Curated annotation (Swiss-Prot):
Organism name: Exiguobacterium sp. (strain ATCC BAA-1283 / AT1b)
Pfam families cross-referenced by the UniProt entry: DUF150_C (PF17384), RimP_N (PF02576)
Keyword Membrane among UniProt keywords: no
GO cellular-component term (any): cytosol
Role: Required for maturation of 30S ribosomal subunits.
Compartments, as annotated in UniProt: Cytoplasm
Protein name: Ribosome maturation factor RimP
Biological process, per Gene Ontology: ribosomal small subunit assembly; translation
C-alpha cells in the first residue's frame, strides 16, 4: 500500500464507519495523463448512488482541508462491484462458500491462477475447490502467496 493510500484510508475510515459502512479499498492510480483516487465502500444490502455521493462529499471536504495529495486527481467513490476484491481477513471469511478467483506470486501445484469455490479459510490458508475437466480438486493456498484475490461471477 502506498503512503498516499494509507493517508487517505486513515481519513476515509472514520467517515465511512460513521455512516455504518465498510471501507473496502483505496487505490491511487494513474491512467493516461490523469490520476484517480478510488475509494470503494460497501454495507449489508449494498450501497446506492446516494451513499456514494454522501461519502464523496464528506471525503472531498476532508481531503481539501488536509491536502495530502500534491498532484491533481479525480475522486471516485463507488461500490466494489460484483467481483469485489478480497484483501482483509473479513473479506475471505465472508467469501467462504462463494466462487472466487485467485492469482499467486509463484506457481502452486503447477498453476498461478485458480478459480472455484472458497471452501475454507483459517487466517493463514485458503482452500479452493477447483474443477479440472470433470474432477474436483481442493487446492490449499497460503494467504501470503496470493497476489490477487476477488469474488468471481459465474454465468450458469
Amino acid at each position: 500500500m502506498s503512503k498516499i493510500t494509507e493517508v487517505v484510508e486513515s481519513i476515509a475510515l472514520p467517515i465511512v464507519e460513521r455512516e455504518n459502512m465498510e471501507l473496502v479499498d483505496v487505490e491511487f492510480v494513474k491512467e493516461g495523463p490523469d490520476w484517480f483516487l478510488r475509494v470503494y465502500i460497501d454495507k449489508p444490502g449494498g450501497v446506492d448512488l446516494d451513499d456514494c455521493v454522501n461519502i464523496n462529499e464528506q471525503l472531498s471536504e476532508k481531503l481539501n482541508e488536509t491536502d495530502p495529495i500534491e498532484q491533481a486527481y479525480y475522486l471516485d467513490v463507488s461500490s466494489p462491484g460484483a467481483e469485489r476484491p478480497l484483501k482483509k481477513p473479513s473479506d475471505f471469511e465472508r467469501a467462504v462458500g462463494k466462487n472466487v478467483y485467485m492469482k499467486t506470486f509463484a506457481p502452486i501445484d503447477g498453476a498461478k491462477e485458480f478459480e472455484g469455490i472458497l471452501t475454507a479459510y483459517d487466517g493463514e490458508t485458503v482452500v479452493i475447490e477447483t474443477r479440472i475437466k470433470t474432477r474436483k480438486k481442493a487446492v490449499s493456498l497460503p494467504v501470503d502467496k496470493i497476489a490477487q484475490a476477488r469474488l468471481a461471477v459465474t454465468f450458469s
